[in-house]
Amino acid sequence: MSSNDPSALPYRDTKPQGSADFYFATNATFRFLIGRFGLAGWRRYLEELGRGYFAPVNQQWRRGGLGAVARYWRDFFAAEPGGVVTVEELPDRVEVVVHACPAIKHLRAGGREVVKEYCQHCFFLGVARAEAAGLTMRLAGGNGSCRHTYGRPSAELPVQDMQSIVEARL
């Protein structure tokens, strides 16, 4: 990415990729929040994070539509160490197919016990962000490979089946 092609990410970094050790901190934080506040409290935290912290990106998505969503996810995963991801922009939706999740991959390589609800965080964050941008979001899979779908309301995505989000495990 050249300096003439700014990233769709809301932050700037001098290194080409983030630090994979962040995944250890995220996993530990989720474990703490779930233990302290329960699943409902953790979900509220993620929803507020999706609406609040990600507000600048959500606004980009609202203004730029599905093209902005696709660009964001391409830039996001380009900065994540170890992920294998395909982003496809279709007329009514964007499909983010995670063939190898960088977080789960790193947690496993580090021998960490992965919070079993870990993969649900992508759903709760994603729904909050999509709704703020006038879109819908669904998630299927997990535990290292999944599919995120961001769609226009006209895409009429089926109701989310929470059973389709696989629990994370070592």
Explain the meaning of each model-derived region.
Residues 123:
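Ligand-binding pocket scaffold of soluble enzyme catalytic domains
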